[in-house]
């Protein structure tokens, strides 16, 4: 009869699952135990899902399904849904290749798959199946036999049935688990690497910002320092111009006359020489000013130390009009202007008269000298040699004094000198005496401070006082210092403080073996 179809010869694909009945059942298919992993105990009350088995919904069933899902996840290493997806993929790939399920097993797989996708069978929503559709009727009957089985139970039964039919599922899932673990390791390693890179970028960014801030601070400090230095330079330059203008106004006439004598008719050379003289005059003035300031500081410090040592008490008696080491020096640049010689100590009668009648009129203020150098030493000595009286020999241990009286028509004294091969001491003094002789004279003396002190030891105070009264007063214009006049010409000028005699001292007392030849010239200007 046509209705009697050999069902075992049919092969139908339903919902992606192939149903191919096998005439020969696999050995051990009937009643074979479910092949689950040894570490996972079998679920109580959940068999192979035979047809007609119905599960009543309830709290106990739900708890049992959840517990079974946890056990499977612990053993297989995947969640239930992920494990079901792997099992379904394995079934589609390996069906008919790695394993050959029976017709009933295929019906069971299809029914469980439908239960997972659509839930329990509902005849109202399912399409009608023809009377002769044997496979459709078997499939619907198997699906209906599952009853109200939950989705989780259906997935569990599907995995168990597939594991029973094909033990290779365990290896398949294990390989995916290993792959998943490796992927997780790679993901964690990548995440750690990105985190380290992010931390490194943040660190480098912070270091770069710190370096930029430090660089900006350094540039700002350098800019402030450059601005401060430039302002200081401009201030000093302005101060220098003001001082030079004041000094040049005082020496303009002398320098112009001196330059006219050196380069007559050559205006350009005269201006060059005047600028050189003005610059040297400024340098000399600043040096003297610094020396005065330093001497004031040292004197103040020494006085403070003396006060600390001696206490608050001061000496009861002091000498009258005696110049001491701690006397304040002038601060207007006119160093050594009023330096008094020890020869100017007042005698007792003069001191008493000064105390009774008050001080006499002071001497005129002495202007500071101007001194400079110029390198034309060879030409200077050649010119001076033409006048034999302008070349003098200062023997060893001697001091030669050139006395130059002031001239009635003069206002300034100029001097120039040089030596052959060695330096010599030089200084200028002004003697307050009215000399009837206007001629220049040269005096030689064997100066020795020790000899003068020995001679003074044998002189009584009365004789010393009379001797000092007879001596004219002296003012030091230029202190005696050794000058390198064998290398360049030393020159200078000084404004007359009044009528008197200039004493130009060439001191060779420090030399024990050598005599010095001095080439000098003195003249006055109005």
From Swiss-Prot:
The modification Phosphoserine is found at residues 13, 20, 40. GO terms for cellular component: Golgi membrane; mitochondrion. The keyword Nucleus does not apply. It is found in: Golgi apparatus membrane; Mitochondrion. Its main location: Golgi. The GOLD domain is essential for giantin binding. This is Golgi resident protein GCP60. It comes from Rattus norvegicus. The gene is Acbd3.
